[in-house]
Every structure is written in structure tokens, then in C-alpha cells.
Amino acid sequence: IGADPLRWYFLARLTPDVQKRISIAIIAEVASSFINTLWNTYAFFTLYASLDQVDIKQDVPLPERPEIDRWILAMAHRTAAQTTAALEQYDAHRAGSVIESFVDQLSNWYVRRNRRRFWKSESGIDKQSAYRTLYQCLDLVHRLMAPFTPFLSEEIYQNLGRSTDQAAPVSVHMT
């Protein structure tokens, strides 16, 4: 099951005033309901981006992106602001709830609604926009999660951030 689901359970799922119960089943539920959702979204991106040999550094200007891309990016920035505000108040539970909600929207709405864009046989601005948007969202969310899930965040960072930019800091925890 791992340390990250355990850390997520205690830091993000429980409020400080709640009696803490622990079992393998509880941690397995955290892993399957949240951690695996993020991991599967990340795996979807890496699989199709590598198959399509996407140049992730090639940006698509925001006004040229479809409305759904602008929507998820706006939600990502709102998530970052709300998570930062919660962590500045030492409210890990609220920060975790905001992150979980975003990951749910990213996986269950954005990726599912846009699969055809990723699966198109021809390359183009629409496909590049979909990849770039998903990359930006994953890049943001793993950084927000780093204090909660250091191992998962580091794995994603090394594959998304460091692999495309060797000048990037050595660890997600240094960004």
C-alpha cells in the first residue's frame, strides 16, 4: 500500500479533532480512490505523449485553446490558490480536500471528455493543446501534493519535470 496513502489519510482525510482509526482496508481505499486516480491520469498522459512523441515545451497560447482547456487551467490555478491559503493556515485537511476535488475533475471530466483529442491520428494545435493542458495540470498538482505524498510527487516530478528540463531542480521539494 505504501507510505504516501498513509500520509494522505492522516494529513488530508482526517481533521485534527477526529478520533483516528487505522486499518489496511482504510489505507487501501485511500490508495484506490485517490492515489490511483492521479497515477492513472499521469500514466494516461505519459503513455499517449510518448506514443505521439509530443514536444511538451511547444506551448499553445491560451486564447487559442478550447474552452474546456481554459476551464481546467482556471480550476488548476484556483486549486493552487486555495491549497496555498489552507496550508498557510496549517489546515492540511482543507488543502487535501481541494486537491482531491481537482484530481477528480481532472480525471473524471477533463481526461474522459477529451480522450478523442488525445487519440486523434493527426497532429495539430488541438491535440497539442490537450497534451500541454494535461501536462500543466499534472505539473501543478504533483507540486501541491509534495508535502503530503513525497514519494509519488517525486516520481512524477522526475518523469515530467526533470526528464524535459535537466536544468530543473534535482527534486520536487526544491521547486
PLM regions with names:
Residues 11, 52-81, 112-175:
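Acidic, turn-prone loop/beta-hairpin segments
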Residues 28, 96, 142-146:
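Short, charged/polar micro-motifs that form catalytic or ligand-binding hotspots
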Residues 83, 87-94:
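Short helix-adjacent coil turns
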